[in-house]
Swiss-Prot record:
CDD domains: CYP60B-like. This is Cytochrome P450 monooxygenase tpeC. It is found in: Membrane. Its cofactor is heme. One of its GO terms (molecular function) is iron ion binding.
Length: 507
């Protein structure tokens, strides 16, 4: 005999009402807390006297939304144009477009009350997990150990010794571009630059190319990275809001992709180990020090970071300078003439000889100014005791940064800041008032970009070889290529279609 339990209707109603009351109370408490927190942030917070838009001073959520939507660089640029060189961009964050702030935020610090040799990176922005340790987010002491181990591989001497590797991939790029030119189809230069830089850094880190140039396509590992930039912004944004558990619950595909990245990188790193520690590449120094203050996880995390930082940023700058030259035909003609008049053959274009192309180097600097590969501010957190930034006292716990996109386009520092004028870096009197020291595309201080020498070497050699071998004409569909691009730390670049015509000397 079976018995069926029937819940009386009044009891169901009572349960529902109780749940509703508690839910309403919870929502009311949350809303009340948010309102009180906003009132505190606007009227009582230690940063209350700094200018900025009201809603950004009241809540961090608007900063996070801009980050997730990829529009943060434009928003902060507009804030500085409206409010001045120091802007409160979140309840606890200040953005500086004062040249001295570069040194004060990112430089070496001696004799501080805190005793720290640098202002620490903001951990919520840089570390995905507690286990995620690399040269890019390591604490000060361990960062120094990792950087010293890497230093030789990134020195100018080592970069020149790696020229046969770098030059081989640039040779292959030119060959593949000639094939595209023969087909009469436009070349998507964003892809071709990415193929080249990923292949180069893959070889210099893992001892093996990604074969992007060979296959005229991205390796699946590279595609995983390229497809994850917005998801990474979402993850970081939720983490900053204290909601990283939501990212773990709602972004399983991203988590799976991260695991794939980790596992595949470990596999390649183990294969690289088999090549020994005398290859003269970027991670030779790390492998030599494994077990002597550096562990495998740190080598693994650093290797992943080197692949990203050593490929995407260089390819981005090359894409940007190509577009800016195409948009300025007189400048393109002048730099092309400089390159072609300096060399009698392709083989004369080397890492050493391209250093004499003053106008081309100025074009690269001007592209860095208008289209910095990392245009956002890289946040630091003020230590105990507070710090003076550009003569302004900032209390402990505050987040501070210098946004490259905004400071590079500030009319306070640059004549005609929105226009492409390489001459500003060559002593032209029209730009005598420009503060060229404001341009710091590789940052400053103990955590500046260790790959500066390699990046400059690659972009100089690649641009010179492209200009020497091809006449360039932009596809009309790409005339607004730069306008409104989204940025998730790195730019989300649309195709840059360029019609290539081999020059008579090389065809």
């Amino acid at each position: 005999m079976s018995h069926t339990f029937h819940c009386p209707q009044p009891l169901l109603v009572m349960i529902a009402l109780t749940i509703f009351r508690y839910a309403t109370l919870a929502i009311a408490l949350i809303v009340g807390f948010v309102i009180l927190k906003a009132i505190y942030n606007v009227f009582f917070h230690p940063l209350r006297n700094f200018p900025g838009p009201l809603r950004y001073r009241a809540s961090r959520i608007f900063w996070v939304l801009d980050l997730i939507e990829g529009r943060q660089i434009y928003t902060i640029d507009q804030f500085h144009k409206r409010y001045g060189p120091v802007v409160r961009t979140a309840p606890d964050e200040l953005s500086f477009t004062i040249p001295e702030a570069w040194r004060d935020i990112y430089g070496h610090r001696v004799g501080l009350v805190s005793g720290l040799p640098e202002i620490p990176k903001w951990p919520l922005f840089y570390k995905f997990t507690k286990q995620d340790v690399s040269i890019f987010n390591a604490p000060q002491g361990q960062h120094g150990t990792l950087r010293r181990a890497l230093a030789h591989g990134f020195s100018e001497k080592s970069t020149r010794a790696q020229e046969s590797i770098i030059g081989g991939y640039v040779d292959l790029l030119v060959t593949r571009l000639k094939e595209v030119a023969d087909s009469k189809a436009p070349a998507n230069m964003v892809q071709w630059y990415n193929y080249t830089t990923f292949d180069i850094v893959g070889d210099l880190v893992f001892g093996n190319s990604f074969h992007c140039l060979d296959n005229a396509n991205y390796h699946p590992w590279v595609s995983l990275f390229a497809d994850s930039t917005r998801q990474n912004s979402i993850f970081v944004g939720l983490k900053i809001l204290g909601l990283d558990f939501l990212a773990l619950a709602t972004m399983p595909l991203v988590i799976r992709n991260m695991i794939k990245h980790f596992n595949l990188t470990k596999e390649w790193l183990r294969e690289r180990r088999k090549l020994g520690t005398d290859r003269g590449d970027l991670i030779e120094g790390l492998l030599k020090k494994e077990g002597e203050g550096i562990n495998f996880d740190e080598i693994h995390g650093t290797s992943m970071g080197l692949i990203f930082a050593g490929s995407e940023t260089t390819a981005t700058l090359l894409s940007g300078v190509t577009y800016l030259l195409l948009q300025n035909p007189k400048t393109l003609a002048k730099v092309t003439m400089e390159v072609r008049s300096s060399f009698k053959s392709d083989k004369e274009i080397t890492l050493l000889s391209v250093q004499n192309l003053d106008y081309m180097l100025a074009c690269l600097d001007e592209a860095f100014r208008l289209y910095p590969p990392v245009g956002i501010g890289l946040p630091r957190q003020i230590p105990k005791g507070g710090v003076k930034i550009a003569g302004i006292y900032v209390p402990e716990g505050s987040i501070v940064d210098v946004p490259q996109y905004a400071i590079h386009r500030s009319p306070d520092h640059w004549t005609e800041p929105e226009s492409f004028h390489p001459e500003r870096f060559l002593g032209d009197s029209r730009f005598a008032s420009d503060k060229v020291e404001t341009l710091q595309p590789f940052a400053v201080g103990p955590r500046n970009c260790i790959g500066r020498n390699l990046a400059y070497a690659e972009m100089r050699l690649i641009l010179a070889r492209v200009l020497y071998n091809f006449d360039l004409k932009m596809d009309p569909s790409c005339s607004g290529w730069l306008d409104g691009q989204k940025s998730h730390a790195l730019w989300v670049k649309p195709p840059l279609k360029v019609q290539l015509t081999p020059t008579k000397a090389t065809s």
